[in-house]
């Protein structure tokens, strides 16, 4: 059974939290509120998007599967591996400033590869994963990112815009709006997925703990497979089964073929639906009877074989997350709330001043690494794509996305 991650606050911090709550009205969006420093993670939201790639080998395994039904199941598994990897507790990462960038890498040998990383990422035969993110706008807080591995022929384009936090009385939540596109050029296949709602509950009553809830959809743009999942929410009096619970359906041609159940921090199971079992759903599942559940994901068996790493901070640009938030991060790690608040305020004031100057001069902010492309066929119309996509995969017959 899954368990909630409870956060214990000292009396002084509870008093600060209570004073903040008194300023809020239930069911209202929180657009302007400075969080106390003890509620901050020592990292930027841009870096937090890499949590999804913690078990990157599960992503690469998709390339090894011939059957399209099994590939889809493997992608669903990969999608679900990223949720339990977030830092425990109720702290949230920094809100990125406009123009902020974050870059990191995955490869088999960090120590050997890092000194030559710029050359390696240009080499089509080097198995290196590259992640780049940029903060596109501040209001709304839109972030865009790209992940690519030229050797694996995988490209991911992500656009995420967290909604303003909504205070619900005993909880506060934010829906992660946006679309993630995963391209596997070996199979000429693209999977598209949405994101759930994240938040904190137990603000007034019960355990103070994080939660994930809401509906998401995963679909193949090249086959008839799709998946609808619900991240379950356990309220003050809800069933303990709903703690980090998930349920849903995997479909083929809009017809259910698997039921999904479990907990994303423990195990997730799929079970064929009898009426149409055996018609679709992947060749390797043939050894399972219609009444037998199959374990799609077991967190205890996942292996983190490739370490995420970044260039040394002195080699990063001034607008990198590590540069911008260096002093804030240092003070959070030293439990120095006063210095944290002062350094954070300096960054936010600088951003406000620069935005005001641009408005006065009529200058529109232009992203450096991404460009806007209207996507009428996409539920999420405001989509930004990485500028260098055509250069990355110019050896392929069909140009990706663009």
Swiss-Prot record:
Source organism: Dictyostelium discoideum
Under InterPro entries, the record lists: OSBP_sf, Oxysterol-bd, Oxysterol-bd_CS
Q: Which domain of life is it from?
A: Eukaryota
Query: What molecular function terms (GO) are annotated for this protein?
Result: sterol binding
Q: What is this protein called?
A: Oxysterol-binding protein 12
Which SUPFAM superfamilies did the record assign?
Oxysterol-binding protein-like
> Composition bias, kind Basic and acidic residues: at what positions?
336-366
Instruction: Write out the similarity annotation.
Output: Belongs to the OSBP family.
Q: Which residues form a coiled coil?
A: none
């Amino acid at each position: 059974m899954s368990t909630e991650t409870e956060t214990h606050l000292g009396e002084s911090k509870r008093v600060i939290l209570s004073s903040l709550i008194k300023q809020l009205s239930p069911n209202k969006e929180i657009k302007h509120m400075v969080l106390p420093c003890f509620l901050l993670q020592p990292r930027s939201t841009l870096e937090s998007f890499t949590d999804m790639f913690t078990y990157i080998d599960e992503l690469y395994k998709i390339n090894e599967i011939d059957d399209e039904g099994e590939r889809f199941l493997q992608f669903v598994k990969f999608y679900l591996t990223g949720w339990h990897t977030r830092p425990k507790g109720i702290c949230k990462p920094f809100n990125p400033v406009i123009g902020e960038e974050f870059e990191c890498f995955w490869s088999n040998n960090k120590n050997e590869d890092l000194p030559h990383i710029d050359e390696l990422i240009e080499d089509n035969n080097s198995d290196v994963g590259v992640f780049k993110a940029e903060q596109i706008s501040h209001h709304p807080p839109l972030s865009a990112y790209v992940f690519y591995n030229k050797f694996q022929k995988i490209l991911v384009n992500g656009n995420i815009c967290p909604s303003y936090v909504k205070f619900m009385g005993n909880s506060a939540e934010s829906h992660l709006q946006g679309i993630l596109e995963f391209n596997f050029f070996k199979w000429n296949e693209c999977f598209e997925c949405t994101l759930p709602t994240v938040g904190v509950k137990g603000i007034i009553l019960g355990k103070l703990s994080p939660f994930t809830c809401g509906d998401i959809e995963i679909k193949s743009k090249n086959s008839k497979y799709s998946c609808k999942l619900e991240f379950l929410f356990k309220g003050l009096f809800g069933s303990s089964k709903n703690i980090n619970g998930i349920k849903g359906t995997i479909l083929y041609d809009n017809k259910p073929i698997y039921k999904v159940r479990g907990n994303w921090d423990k195990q997730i199971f799929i079970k064929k639906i009898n009426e149409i079992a055996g018609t679709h759903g992947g060749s390797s599942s043939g050894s399972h009877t219609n009444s037998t559940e199959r374990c799609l994901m077991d967190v205890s068996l996942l292996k983190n074989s490739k370490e995420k790493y970044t260039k040394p901070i002195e080699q990063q640009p001034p607008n990198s997350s590590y540069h911008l938030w260096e002093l804030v991060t240092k003070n959070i790690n030293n439990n120095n709330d006063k210095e944290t608040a002062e350094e954070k305020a300096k960054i936010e004031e600088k951003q406000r001043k620069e935005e005001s100057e641009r408005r006065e001069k009529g200058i529109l902010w232009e992203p450096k690494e991404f460009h806007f492309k209207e996507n009428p066929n996409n539920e999420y119309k405001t989509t930004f794509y990485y500028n260098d996509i055509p250069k990355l995969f110019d050896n392929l017959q069909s140009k990706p996305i663009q």
